[in-house]
């Protein structure tokens, strides 16, 4: 993003243009090159929160020891924790409930963090054990942040104190929280019979009467279907007989028509014969 007040485009009066010579320029000439540049003010682009953050970051100045001016007994990096002179060794494994015997090592001190102290699953021994598990749940993140010297955070008071043992008791499944969404509700256990049907004893009189009525209805429907089939077959036979009669009638009428046509063809010849016989007489 460019601005007109950042740099001066026009040369000032009396300013000579830069000339590049073959030799190396001295320190005085290099210093004169940047005299006409203006500084940029970034205070308008920095918010109040960011300004406070920058002031906190740049307020710490390096000590003279950090620049190499340290004494014989002063550490090179004063902001870091001194190394532990004890040897780095893991303590022997202990499987007790309280993990009291950690053994000699770098993590055996009371104020140090043990990375091997993972959550130990213990089954509750009664209703009191499940309630103690909900009260004594421990967050390892709280323990790490509390022992970090370079981090400053405001932790909620609801978290457990770092002095509590690293144990997480698993609550029974019966005390699990219900699902939040109504669509994720657990299906209700299905009963032996669906809703709307009552249990009927097969040896009862009502069940026998119902089965008898169903059997009678099935037999009636089957008899009705058989009667319809027989009626259809009978109609088919009647139609076939009527078709045969009609065919015979058509053949008879065709023969009569042919006979009549032959008679009409012979009538003019007979008339001519009669006329010829009458003229001869």
From Swiss-Prot:
Location of the protein in the cell: Nucleus
Q: Does the entry annotate any disulfide bonds, and if so which pairs?
A: none
Which segments carry the region annotation Basic motif?
Answer: 208-228
Protein keywords: Activator, Disease variant, DNA-binding, Isopeptide bond, Nucleus, Phosphoprotein, Transcription, Transcription regulation, Ubl conjugation
Q: Which PROSITE patterns match?
A: BZIP
**GO MF terms on file?**
DNA-binding transcription activator activity, RNA polymerase II-specific; DNA-binding transcription factor activity, RNA polymerase II-specific; identical protein binding; protein-containing complex binding; RNA polymerase II cis-regulatory region sequence-specific DNA binding; sequence-specific double-stranded DNA binding
Protein's name in the database: CCAAT/enhancer-binding protein epsilon
Species source reads Homo sapiens (Human)
Q: In which tissues has expression of this protein been reported?
A: Strongest expression occurs in promyelocyte and late-myeloblast-like cell lines.
State the gene name recorded for this protein. CEBPE
**Where is the bZIP domain positioned along the sequence?**
204-267
- Summary of subunit composition and partner proteins: Binds DNA as a homodimer and as a heterodimer. Can form stable heterodimers with CEBPA, CEBPB and CEBPD. Interacts with GATA1 and SPI1. Interacts with SMARCD2.
**GO terms classed as biological process:** cellular response to lipopolysaccharide; defense response; DNA-templated transcription; granulocyte differentiation; integrated stress response signaling; macrophage differentiation; myeloid cell differentiation; phagocytosis
Q: What does this protein do?
A: Transcriptional activator. C/EBP are DNA-binding proteins that recognize two different motifs: the CCAAT homology common to many promoters and the enhanced core homology common to many enhancers. Required for the promyelocyte-myelocyte transition in myeloid differentiation.
Q: How is it modified after translation?
A: Phosphorylated.
Q: Where do the segments described as Disordered lie?
A: 1-30
Show the SUPFAM superfamilies listed in the entry: Leucine zipper domain
Q: Which InterPro entries match?
A: bZIP, bZIP_sf, C/EBP, C/EBP_chordates
Give the primary localization class.
nucleus
Family according to the record: Belongs to the bZIP family. C/EBP subfamily.
One GO cellular-component annotation of the UniProt record comes to: nucleoplasm
Q: Which disease is it linked to?
A: Specific granule deficiency 1: An immunologic disorder characterized by recurrent pyogenic infections, defective neutrophil chemotaxis and bactericidal activity, and lack of neutrophil secondary granule proteins. Neutrophils of affected individuals lack lactoferrin and show abnormal nuclear segmentation, bilobed nuclei, low alkaline phosphatase, and increased number of neutrophil mitochondria and ribosomes. SGD1 inheritance can be autosomal dominant or recessive.
């Amino acid at each position: 993003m460019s601005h007109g007040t950042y740099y001066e485009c026009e040369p000032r009066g009396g300013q000579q243009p830069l000339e590049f010579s073959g030799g190396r320029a001295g320190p005085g000439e290099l210093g004169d090159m940047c005299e006409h540049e203006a500084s940029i003010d970034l205070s308008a682009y920095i918010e109040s929160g960011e300004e406070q953050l920058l002031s906190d970051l740049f307020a710490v100045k390096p000590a003279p020891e950090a620049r190499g001016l340290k004494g014989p007994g002063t550490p090179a990096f004063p902001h870091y924790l001194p190394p532990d002179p004890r040897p780095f060794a893991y303590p022997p494994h202990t499987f007790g409930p309280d993990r009291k015997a950690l053994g000699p090592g770098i993590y055996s001190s009371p104020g140090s963090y043990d990375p091997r102290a993972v959550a130990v699953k213990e089954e509750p021994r009664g209703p009191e054990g499940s309630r103690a598990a909900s009260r004594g749940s421990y967050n390892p993140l709280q323990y790490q942040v509390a022992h970090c010297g370079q981090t400053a955070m405001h932790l909620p008071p609801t978290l457990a104190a770092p002095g509590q043992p690293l144990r997480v008791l698993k609550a029974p499944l019966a005390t699990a929280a219900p699902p939040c969404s109504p669509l994720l509700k657990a299906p209700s256990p299905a009963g032996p019979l669906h809703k709307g049907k009552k249990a009927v004893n097969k040896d009862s009189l009502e069940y026998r009467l119902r089965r008898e009525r169903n059997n009678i209805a099935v037999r009636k429907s089957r008899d009705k279907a058989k009667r319809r089939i027989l009626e259809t077959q009978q109609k088919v036979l009647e139609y076939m007989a009527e078709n045969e009669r009609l065919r015979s009638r058509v053949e008879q009428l065709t023969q009569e028509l042919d006979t009549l046509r032959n008679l009409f063809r012979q009538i003019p010849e007979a008339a001519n014969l009669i006329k010829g016989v009458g003229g001869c007489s």
